[in-house]
Regions:
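Short helix->loop/beta-hairpin flanking segments within DNA-binding domains
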Residues: 33-61
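Short, amphipathic alpha-helical interaction segments positioned at domain boundaries
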Residues: 104-119
């Protein structure tokens, strides 16, 4: 008989919601993200509002991420390059950077379902 494991995570706010989401789906990605890459991307994902939707990776938001995560300019650039190389983010024709759609969770609540099969 199959055992169904259900667990809810409640009370995650801001970047913690997005970092946890990335941690849950990470083993299923073609190329896994490091813990720091998940932290950087999750922080960018947490920004809300019209300005964030237009250019989430603008200088303003990069500065915010550097402050929150205590990163240097070079450190953030290295993580962004790694995220780009892994296909987590991409540069659009107009120069803006966007997050790969398969990484974006639903707002406020995300459900997951998967199964593993032996053999």
């Amino acid at each position: 008989m199959a055992v169904i494991i259900q667990k809810g995570l409640v009370g995650l706010v801001g970047k913690d919601y997005y970092i946890r989401h990335l941690s849950i789906i990470n083993p299923f990605l073609p190329v896994e993200l490091t813990p720091k890459e998940r932290e950087v991307l999750g922080t960018f994902m947490s920004f809300k509002g019209e300005v964030a939707e237009k250019d989430r990776f603008s200088t303003y938001f990069r500065k915010e991420v550097k402050e929150v995560l205590k990163l240097s300019d070079g450190g953030l650039s290295n993580h962004l390059k790694a995220l780009k190389d892994k296909g987590a983010i991409k540069e659009e024709l107009n120069g803006t950077i966007t997050i790969a759609s398969f990484l974006l969770p639903a707002e406020r609540q995300q459900f997951y379902q998967f199964k593993i099969v032996e053999g």
